Amino acid sequence: MDITVILCTYNRCQSLAKALESLAAQTLPSAVEWEVLVVDNNSKDQTRTVAEDYSRRHPGRFRYLFEPQPGKSHALNAGIRDSHGDIIAFIDDDATAEPTWLQNLTSGLHGNEWAGAGGRIVPAKNISFPRWFPPDEPRLFRTLALFSCGLEPGPLTEPPLGTNMAFRKEMFDRYGGFRTDLGPCPGSEIRGEDTEFGGRILAAGARMRYEPAAIVLHPVSPDRLRKQYFLTWWFDKGRSEFRQFGIPRDATWFVAGVPLSLFRRLARWTLLWILSISPARRFSCRLKVWTLAGQIVESYRHGHSRETVTAS
C-alpha cells in the first residue's frame, strides 16, 4: 500500500466525524492505494461507533485500532506499527482537510529525495487577534496549532506540526518513533512529540519539503485566544524543551540543581517584560518568562529525581 493516514483520537467523537468526512472526500489518482487508520486512545465516548461506521461505509478505506495505554505518543506509535503504507501522513481529530490535501502532501515522497513533508495549517474561520498578540512572531501561531511558511514550496528548515505532516515509513525504522515522555496524556499537556521527531530527522541530515497547497483547517476556539491559554502552553513548552535538550551547554553553576544561567535569563526577560510599553511586546516577553519558568521547574524535577536515585 502507498499511504496510511494516521488519526489519533481521544473523546472527540463529534469533531472526529467531521475529520473523517473530509478524509473520505480526498481525491487521489486511482493507482494510489491508501487507507485511514483511526487510533482510539482509550476514549469513553462514541468514538468507536463513529470510526466503525466509516469502516462499514467505506470498506477497505478506514480501519479502527484501539490503543489502551494513555498518551498521544503511545497512540501514534501503535498506529505506525499497524500501518500498511510506505508513506505515513498525520492529521488531528479536530481538523479537516481540503480534498487535495493528501495528494499534495505526499506526492513528493514516493521517491528518495524527501524524507517527509509538511503543509499549511490555517484557521477554520476568520479570527480577530487581541491587541496583546504579537502578529510579527510566527512562532506564536504554533500555540494555536497553525503553521505556514508562505505560499512557495521548498525545503523545510523547521519541523512541521503533527496536524499536517507526512514521512516515508522507513524514517521511523531508521530514527525511531515518537518520544513517549512528550505528547499530551492524562494529567499532562506537555507537547512537542511531533516537532521533536521532525527536528530529529532534520538534525540527522534528512530533507523535508514544505507543501503550501496541502491545506488543513484547524479550529481556533475563543478560549485559545486568552492570555492564560498562551501562558500555560508556553510554560509546558519550556518543560518540553528541557526534556528534549537537557541542561544548557553553558551551564556551569547550579542552584538547587538548576543551572544558574536559566535564572539569569529569567531575570533579564522579566525586566524586559516590566519595561516594555507595547502590549504585544510586553506579552511576548512575558511568554519568554513563562517558558523559562517551565524549563526551571523541569530542571529542578530532573535534578531532584537524579539525586533521589543516587541516594537510594
Residue ranges of predicted features:
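Short, well-formed alpha-helical segments that are part of the catalytic scaffolds
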Residues: 12-26
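Conserved donor NDP-sugar-binding/catalytic core segment of glycosyltransferases
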Residues: 100-133
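Non-catalytic, C-terminal membrane-associated alpha-helical segments of glycosyltransferases
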Residues: 232-239, 246-312
